[in-house]
Amino acid sequence: MAKYRAGRINEEVKKEVSNIIHNDIKDPRLSAMVSVTDVNVTKDLKYAKVYVSIFGNEKAKEESLQALKSSVGFIRKEVGRRVKLRNTPEVIIEVDNSIERGMHIDELLHSIKENESNDN
């Protein structure tokens, strides 16, 4: 039962953080496409690790990450207002590169497939 509750909390916080990032943060540095891939809230509801994937060039990624990290107080306040929890978790932003790694692996597999078809 506790795992089910934790999963619901994680999904609810993920949905709200995503909405906050896309609709409420007005930082001009947030120009790259930012996607919330996962959220892990600790059992005591003190911390919420928010995993984000940022698409764009390296400069845009760095600026977007800095914008997100400078907005953690605002994000925490909004999460506390929108999600009714005993404690409002402290938001920790982490970069998730799994989507980029997956795209790179897909490109490698595609190039291998092309090389095999050219050899035949």
Curated annotation (Swiss-Prot):
Subcellular compartments: Cytoplasm
InterPro entries: KH_dom-like_a/b (IPR015946), RbfA (IPR000238), RbfA_dom_sf (IPR023799), Ribosome-bd_factorA_CS (IPR020053)
GO MF: ribosomal small subunit binding
PANTHER family given in the database record: RIBOSOME-BINDING FACTOR A, CHLOROPLASTIC-RELATED
Domain of life where this protein originates: Bacteria
GTP-binding found in the keyword field: no
GO biological process entries: maturation of SSU-rRNA
Source taxonomy: Bacteria, Bacillati, Bacillota, Clostridia, Eubacteriales
UniProt key word Cytoplasm: yes
Protein name per Swiss-Prot or TrEMBL: Ribosome-binding factor A
Purpose: One of several proteins that assist in the late maturation steps of the functional core of the 30S ribosomal subunit. Associates with free 30S ribosomal subunits (but not with 30S subunits that are part of 70S ribosomes or polysomes). Required for efficient processing of 16S rRNA. May interact with the 5'-terminal helix region of 16S rRNA.
Keywords annotated in UniProt: Cytoplasm, Ribosome biogenesis
